[in-house]
């Protein structure tokens, strides 16, 4: 039996299931997500941006005022709201996977782990001055990154798809995901 990438069949077989992109901060969830959404004819949501709208505060301000646990509480509430919808590609926060209660929502959709190599991840975080990363504030970023990767690895590994990233562009990563989606939902050639 052969399988072939047929965009309309892939979209139909997905049946509106939400695609959740998980991975470390800087893994490319927010940049890959819009490209994947376009391929799937879905809408795109950046969960951190939605949290900022709901909380009327920036992620870094929530971390300062409420602490990480306070932020994670809001993140879980927003995830539950997102989970009520359909036909979305969602760029989640890097630590969303650390709460087991979130997996009840995530497993209703398809979870895709974006996993750039450590050097690429660190280079992205170092070069991106537009995004504040509260967990990296006032600490050695490499040590923090290594620690977070170690803490979250098994949680990320629960994803339905694991996408290793070397130097691919967000557009290329979206195409790889689309192809792998067609394989896991087994779109048969007519």
Swiss-Prot record:
Substrate binds at residues 48, 72, 94, 152. Keywords: Amino-acid biosynthesis, Aromatic amino acid biosynthesis, ATP-binding, Cytoplasm, Kinase, Magnesium, Metal-binding, Nucleotide-binding, Transferase. Pathway: Metabolic intermediate biosynthesis; chorismate biosynthesis; chorismate from D-erythrose 4-phosphate and phosphoenolpyruvate: step 5/7. The keyword Disulfide bond does not apply. InterPro entries: P-loop_NTPase, Shikimate/glucono_kinase, Shikimate_kinase/TSH1, Shikimate_kinase_CS. It catalyses: shikimate + ATP = 3-phosphoshikimate + ADP + H(+). It is an enzyme of class 2 (transferase). Its main location: cytoplasm. GO terms for cellular component: cytosol. Mg(2+) binds at residue 30. One of its GO terms (molecular function) is shikimate kinase activity. SUPFAM superfamilies: P-loop containing nucleoside triphosphate hydrolases. ATP binds at residues 26-31, 133. Transmembrane segments: none annotated. The keyword Ubl conjugation does not apply. CDD domains: SK (cd00464). GO terms for biological process: amino acid biosynthetic process; aromatic amino acid family biosynthetic process; chorismate biosynthetic process. It holds the Pfam family SKI. Its cofactor is Mg(2+). Its EC number is 2.7.1.71. Catalyzes the specific phosphorylation of the 3-hydroxyl group of shikimic acid using ATP as a cosubstrate. Belongs to the shikimate kinase family. This is Shikimate kinase. It comes from Prochlorococcus marinus (strain SARG / CCMP1375 / SS120).
